[in-house]
């Protein structure tokens, strides 16, 4: 299953990037692989709202099992101010979900509050 993590680098982490510029992709990949996943991509965005986006692929049970460990390791390092992770799917894989929603909508399984 795909997971998208995004977050902010701490002031301390930003100082470290300026003091010792380096590509952190290998370090991120090592952590992800150590937790049973695979790094798909890692981006620095530095736009004010967030500083990085990481896309990983984990078996669901592995990710949920290791989410707290990941959070403790990354946030405990002092380099990261905040991080959030959400599940994701490729657009082509979402078609099945769209079809299921279409079937449910046509069966009127959900009625909006304004309709009752």
Predicted regions and their residues:
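An amphipathic, aromatic/His-enriched active-site/gating alpha helix that lines ligand/cofactor pockets
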Residues: 57-87
